[in-house]
Amino acid sequence: MPIFFYLFATLITISSVCVVLSKNSVYSVLWLIFAFINGAGLMILLGAEFLAMMLIVIYVGAVAVLFLFVIMMLDMHFNKTITQLKANLALSIFIALIMFADLVIIILLGTKNINFNSNVSFTITNNISNTKAIGGVLYTDFMLPFQMAGLILFVAMIACITLTLKKREGVKRQDISKQLRHNKENTVLMTKPILNKGVENIKYE
């Protein structure tokens, strides 16, 4: 069992690094799918088959595939993105150094000073399935973090929608409120043209 743990953990680490370093967003999503699959393998080793199935069905089958289609449909200019990243290179390096320092501190100090909540029990027996045990802990002891996670996902969904709202020049769009305000006084114009002459000085909206 330890050899499988180290195998899945190593593959997750490699795929996570490739997600960040890949220049093509499509390749990043494919590496992310690979990381989710290895994460499901770790869940199986822990005896949580339900979580492993949810990782495959929801994250790989729905979320990651949705990311893939959204990236493929968006008109993303990679050269422009690289230019923007170079403009914020100093800030990016500073944040990366802070995160790296946090990881070093955690590795050196370990988890000795972390007080775990001993009141939270997560026991799986023959009478209680892992689905029931996870649901009992998730919706009782961790109800507030669960709601916050849902709120974060909701904000991320709104952000994905706003990415598709690009204003393009020369594209005519419908103004529903303006159409509903129209009546016969401002849409129908009665005129009497002169014989053999066209109608001039008419403004169209």
UniProtKB/Swiss-Prot annotation:
GO terms for molecular function: NADH dehydrogenase (ubiquinone) activity; quinone binding. Keywords: Cell membrane, Membrane, NAD, Quinone, Translocase, Transmembrane, Transmembrane helix. It comes from the Bacteria. It is an enzyme of class 7 (translocase). The chain crosses the membrane at residues 1-21, 26-46, 54-74, 89-109, 142-162. It is found in: Cell membrane. It catalyses: a quinone + NADH + 5 H(+)(in) = a quinol + NAD(+) + 4 H(+)(out). Its EC number is 7.1.1.-. It is a multi-pass membrane protein. GO terms for cellular component: plasma membrane. NDH-1 shuttles electrons from NADH, via FMN and iron-sulfur (Fe-S) centers, to quinones in the respiratory chain. Couples the redox reaction to proton translocation (for every two electrons transferred, four hydrogen ions are translocated across the cytoplasmic membrane), and thus conserves the redox energy in a proton gradient. Belongs to the complex I subunit 6 family. This is NADH-quinone oxidoreductase subunit J. It comes from Rickettsia conorii (strain ATCC VR-613 / Malish 7).
